[in-house]
Amino acid sequence: MNREALCHDDPIGHDRLRPDSIPRDPKWTDEQWQAITARNSDILVAAAAGAGKTAVLVERLIGIIKEGVDVDRLLVVTFTNAAAAEMRERIRTALTKELARHPHQTWLRQQLVLLNRATITTLHSFCLDLVRKYYYRLDLDPAFRVADETEIALLRQDVLDEVFERFYERAGAKEGTESKGEYFTALVDAYGGDRDDSPLQDIVLQLYEKALSQPWPEQWLQDILGKFQEAGDTIAEQTLPGELPAWEALPWFAALREEMSIDLAEVESLLVRALSLCRQPGGPAAYGDAVTADLQLTQDLHLAAGRSWTQLHECFQALSFTRVKAVRGPVDESLKKEVSRLRYQAKKKLTDLQKKYFLRTPHDLVSDLTQVLPLMATLVDVVLAFDRAFQAAKREKRLVDFNDLEHFCLRLLLDESASPGVPVPSSLALELKEHFAEVLTDEYQDTNTVQETILTLLSRNNRFMVGDVKQSIYRFRLAEPNLFLEKYRSFSPYDTPGPVNSDHGAPDHAFSGQGASVPGARIDLAKNFRSRRNVLSAVNDLFRRIMTPRAGEMAYDRQAELVYGAAFPELPGRSGDPVIELWLLQRQPDADGSEESIETQQNANETKGAIDGDHKNIAKAGESPAQNTADVAGESPSDDAGEDAGQPTGGEEELLLLETAQYEARLAARRIEELMKSAMPVYDREQGGYRPVCYRDIVILMRSTKGRADIFLEEFRAAAIPAYADTGAGYFEATEVSILLSLLRVIDNPCQDIPLAAVLRSPIFRFTGEDLARIRLAEPRKTFFDAIEAFIGQAEAAARDTFTPIDPVAIRLREFLRQIDAWRTLARRDSLAKLIATIYRETGFYDYAGAMPGGGQRQANLRALYDRARQYEATTLRGLFRFLRFIERLQDQGGDLGTARTLGEKEDVVRIMSIHKSKGLEFPVVFVAGLGSQFNLQDLRRDLLIHKNLGLGPVVVDTQLRYRYPTVAKLAIQRRLHRETLAEEMRILYVALTRAKEKLILLGTVREVAKSAQQWLHDAEGIPVAAALPDEVLLRAKCYLDWIGPALVGHPDGQEIRRWAEGAPALGATLPENNLTMTKNETMTEQERIDGSSRWRLFYAAKKELIGLRKETGSETPFNPVWLEKLRRLEPIIPTDLVDASLSWSYPYTGLSGIAAKVAVSRIKKQFVWHSPETPPSSETPPSLEIPPSLETPPSLETQTPSPDALVDLRPRFLQQDRRLTATERGSAVHLFLQHLDLAGEISQAGIAGQADRLVKLELLSLEQRQALNEEEILRFLESPLGHRLRKAKQVMREVPFTLALPAAEIYPEKRAEGESVIIQGVIDCLFEEDDGWLLLDYKTDRCPVGMDRERWLQQLRDSYLGQVNLYHRAVESVLKVKVKGRCLFLLSIGREMAL
C-alpha cells in the first residue's frame, strides 16, 4: 500500500481509503478479508476453531489505523490479560515494520506512542480505569483497591454469617405471628440442611451471583419473585368457557410442555420401531394392534403437549393401554422379545411421566407456588440484606471486586432516567461513544448480560465481535452464549459494504443488496488452519450427528462445519493423515456377572437421584408423584441393568473412578511410548518441515484433573515419561510449604504440639524421632514446649551434678529456643514478608529445597509463599496471627493456592490439563481421557434451583411431617438446566477435539463393550448416516461415550461396533500387540481424504490386559562415583529410581478405608440376630452374629414416613415454635429419671412425683422433661413382678456404659478385614443381680401406632431390639465376666414384660 499519500505529518486532513477499494491480500481467504475490511455496521464474526481469528483481528486493527484512526480511539476488549498483551505486541510489531518502510512518517511514530495508552484490555481493566477516573461520581474512596479473590471470598463469608445471625436474632424476637423472622426460620428448616445452614447460605450466594450477572440485579430479583405472586393471582381468576386458565401463561408450564414433547418423541420412536418389527416376516403380527393403539395414544399426547397443559393433563389422566393379543402360529422369538421390550420401555416411560407430572391437578401445582411464596420472598430479602451488608463492608475496607467494577462502570454509563430494560446513556457514555471509532470484542461468546449492556452503551453501530459459540464453555462463570446466537440469527450474511462515513461509525445504508435495514452483518470463518483434514472430518462427522438446536443449542450445519485450510506438505513414504483412535477400556466383570459399571452406578446415584430425589416421604398417597419417577434422560437397558446390583458406597465409587483413571493412564503411557518409539513425524511450522514427535507435542486432556491428574503423573513416572500437570491445587500439601507454615505457627504460638514437633523433625532443625521421645518423657503431661524446657533443665542439672558435658540434644534445643525467640521479636517489629525472607536466609531452607528432587518447583512454591505474604500485607490486614488465620480459613473452606508454575513452553514434557485450560491452545497429538466418566449433574439435586429466565425452582417442604416434593417450577427448571448442562458438555467436547493438529486419541471406559455397543446400535437404529441423532437419545446421554458411540454406528469404520455387539471379538481375549503399535492402516488414503470422510480405528482392552503394561522400578541402585562430584556442586544425588519406587508404592490396606474404627450400638443394632433365634445362647458361648440379607442395604429415607411425634426438631431451641418434647426426648427423660430413682423410697404416685421434683431442683431434669414423665406408667413398672425383683436385687447397675472389640468381619462382612477389629460402644439401661445370676433389663417407651394390631407390633418390637440386646448380652459376659441368666424388655406404655 502506498502510505506516502496517507501517512503524512497532518493525518487529520488526509483522504481515507474506502474498504472496498483496498486490494485483497492473497494470504487471506475471502471471508478473512471481509472480516478485515468490512465497515459501517455491527459485525459478528463466527470464527471456527483454528480459523486465525486473532490474526484477523490484529490485521483489522492495523487496517483501521492505516485509514487514519488513532489507535487510542479503538476499544479492544479481550478475554484475558495475556491476550491483550499479545494483541498489543502484534500491533506494535506491525507498526514498527511499517515505520521501517516509511521512516520519515511522524504519524506512524505518533501511533507507537499512543499505543502505550490504547484501550486494549480486558473489560474488567477497562471498568477499573473508568472507575478510578470518575470515583467521585460513585462516592468511592479514591484509595480503593481491587480485592484478591481469596480475600473477598473470606470477607463474603464473614458478612453472610453476620447477616444470618441478624435474621436469627429477629426470629428469636418473635415479632408477630407472620413476621419475616418466622418466615426465615421456616426457610432455614426447609432449605438449610440437617446439620447447619450452609446449604441455605450456598443458595443465597448462588442467587446473589446470578443477580449480579444482570444489569439491574434488584429488579431481576423482584421479577422472579413476581412470577410466584402472579401464580397466586391466577388461582382467583375465573375462566370463561372455551378459554384457557390464566395459569397456563406461567412460564414453567410452557417449559415443561416443551420437555414433554421430547419425551413423547422418544416414546414414538420406540413404538415405531416395535411396529416395524411386528410387520417383518416372522414378526409378532398379533402385537401390531396394541402397538398401533399405543402409538396413536402417544401421538395424541404429543398434540396435546403443543396446545396446553390442561389438555395434556386430561390425556394423561385417561392414560390406558390395550392388551396384546396372543401370538398364534410360528413366530421369530427374538423379534417377539424385542417388540415386547420396546413396548415395555414405551409404556414405562409414559407411566413414569404420568406419576411424576400428572398425578396432581394443575390447581394443586399452582397452589404449591403460593405456598412457597413467603419463603421465596424471605430468600430475596436475605439476598438484598446481604448485598447491602457486603457493599458496606467493602466500602469500609476500601475494597471492590470484579462484580463491583462492572456495576460501577454501568452506573457511570447510565443516565439517571434509565430504567430496567431502557438503558439510557449518560453524558459520559455519549462522550465515550463519540470517542471510540470502533468497539472490538474478542471471545464474544463468553460475554454476560452486564458486559453486553456496557459495550452497547459505548458503541454506535460500530461493534466488531469475534467468537465461536461452539467454544462457549464458561456458563459456570455466567457467560451467556445466547447473546452470540441471537445476533447470529438476526444478522444478515455479509454482502457488499456501503460507503464509509466520515466518523467510522453508523452506516449510510445497510449491507443487504436491496438496501433493507438489518441490525448488522455476520461473517463465517469456517476454514481451519490448525488441524489435518482427518481431524476436521472426524469432528464434523461426530458433531453433525450430535449437535442439534435442542440438545446443543444450535445446529451443526454447513455454516458451522470446519473447512480444511491448513497446508501440511506431503511426507515421503506416508500415504495420508493419521487415523483417529477410539479406545474402549473394558472393566472385567465378576464371575457371576454382577459387577456394575462405573457409568451405571453413577447413573443411579447421581442422575436418577438428581431428577427423582425431590420426591421424599409424601404424606398421603396420590398427593405427589413420589415413586417410580423417571429419569429425565429416559430409560435405557443400561439403566435397567444397574438396578440388579447393589450400589457402592461413596468411598467405593471413588475407588472405582480412580482405578479407571489408572488403567486409562497406563494405556496412554503405552501409546505414548509407541509414538515416541516409531518417531511419528509432526510438522513444525517454525522449522518449516517435519521432525520426530517430542513429549512436548503431546497433551492429555480431561474434563476435570481433580484426583485424576496425579494418577496419570504416577503412571507416566513409572513409564519414565516426563509429564507436568497444572492442577491448581496441592500447594498447602507441598512438603516445603507445610514445613514453613508449621514454623510460622510455632513463631506465632510455640505451645502448639503438632506444628512444634513438625518443625523439630524438619530438615531445618533435624531432630530425630528418638530425640522427640526423650523430650516428651521429660514432661509427659504438659505441652511439648513445656517438655522442651523441662528437658533442658534436667540436662543442665544432670551435667552440674555429674560434672559431665551437657546433653547435645539440650544444647540444640536451647539454640532452637533462642532462634524462635529472635524470630518472634522480628515478627512483632517488622513485616511478615521480611520475617519469611529472614527465615529463608538464616536457615538456608530455600537452598536446601532447591537441592531436593523437584527443587525448582519447591523453590517456586517458597517464593509464592513470600509473595503471598507481601500481597496479604497490602490489604487492610496485618500481622502473623491474622495471616495464619487467613490460611486456616482458606483451607477450612477447601481453598488452595495451586503450586507455583515453573514450566516453560519449550520444556519437553507431556502436558496434563483440563479441557477448559486447553482452550486457545493446540498440540500435534491430543489424548482425550475419561470419556466414560459421567457428567456432573449434582447441582440438579439441590432443593432450590435457579435459572436466569425461569427464576426460582423450590421444593415444597413440610418440616413437621418431614416430606418434600418439587414444585412445577423446580420440575421445569430442572429439565431446562439439564438440557443446558448437556449443551455445555457438548461444547466442551468440541473444544477438546479441536485442540489436535495431527493425531487424536480418545480413551473411555465401559463395563462391558458388548452391552455398550448393543445400546449404541439401539440408539442409532433407523437413523440415516448423515442425519442427526434424535434429541431424546442425545439428552439421555450420561457421558461423552453416549454421544460418540451412537454417532459412529453409521460410520464406515463403525462396523467394529456391530461386531462388538455380537460378541466378537470375545471379551477378555488377549490384546493383540499390533492393536497397541498401530502397525497397519495408520493413515487414511488419498481417496478418503478427497471424499472428506474421516478414518477411525476402534479398539477395546479388558482390564486384565492393562495390568501388565506398567513397568516395575528396580529397588537397588549401585554407588556411583559421580555422586561425589554432584555433592561438590551441591546438586541432588538421591537416585531417582529409588524415589520413584517410593512414590509409586500403593497403600496395602485400601480395602479397610470404609471401615469405622468405632461405632455405636444404635448404628448397627438392626444388623445383628442370632443364627438360631429360638435357641438362647449359653453363657459359655457368646452368641455369633450375622447380617440378615434383608438388612444389607439400609432402608432409604425416601421410603420411610415417620410419624410427626417421632421427629426431632433440628432447629435451635430458641427458634422452636413448640417447646414440647418429641418422642425421643421423652424417652430420654424417662431413662434419666429411672437412672436416678431411689429404689428404696416410697413406691406410690405421690412418691414418684416427689422424686421427680427433687431431680428438677437438683437440675438433673429440666422442667419440660419433668412434665413429660408419665407417673402412672412408672408406678406400674415398679409394682410389676419385674419391678419387685429389681427392688429386691442384691446389686443394681443402671446406665452401664461399655466398650467392646468385635472382629471387623462381623460388622462389615463385605470387606476384606481379616485380623481387624471394630470398637462397639453402648449403654445398658439396667443390670441387676439375683441369687442365680444377672438379669439384663432394657425399658422402652415405644407406643403402638393407632390402628395397628398389638401382637404384630410386639413382634416388630422384638425383632427390632433383639440385635441390640444380643450385643448387650455379649458385652456383659465378655467385659464383666458374669453370667447373664436372662434378658427382657419392659414396655412402659402397656406395662408388659417381654423376655428375649
UniProtKB/Swiss-Prot annotation:
Residues 615-920 form the UvrD-like helicase C-terminal domain. Keywords: ATP-binding, DNA damage, DNA repair, DNA-binding, Exonuclease, Helicase, Hydrolase, Isomerase, Nuclease, Nucleotide-binding. GO terms for biological process: double-strand break repair via homologous recombination. Its EC number is 3.1.-.-, 5.6.2.4. Residues 26-532 form the UvrD-like helicase ATP-binding domain. One of its GO terms (molecular function) is 3'-5' DNA helicase activity. It catalyses: Couples ATP hydrolysis with the unwinding of duplex DNA by translocating in the 3'-5' direction; ATP + H2O = ADP + phosphate + H(+). Its cofactor is Mg(2+). Residues 1181-1199 have a biased composition (Low complexity). ATP binds at residues 47-54. GO terms for cellular component: cytosol; DNA helicase complex. Residues 1-25, 590-649, 1171-1205 are annotated as: Disordered. Transmembrane segments: none annotated. The keyword DNA damage applies. InterPro entries: AddA, DNA_helicase_UvrD-like_C, DNA_helicase_UvrD/REP, P-loop_NTPase, PDDEXK-like_dom_sf, PDDEXK_AddAB-type, Restrct_endonuc-II-like, UvrD-like_ATP-bd. It comes from the Bacteria. Heterodimer of AddA and AddB/RexB. The heterodimer acts as both an ATP-dependent DNA helicase and an ATP-dependent, dual-direction single-stranded exonuclease. Recognizes the chi site generating a DNA molecule suitable for the initiation of homologous recombination. The AddA nuclease domain is required for chi fragment generation; this subunit has the helicase and 3' -> 5' nuclease activities. Belongs to the helicase family. AddA subfamily. This is ATP-dependent helicase/nuclease subunit A. The lineage of its organism: Bacteria, Bacillati, Bacillota, Clostridia, Eubacteriales. The gene is addA.
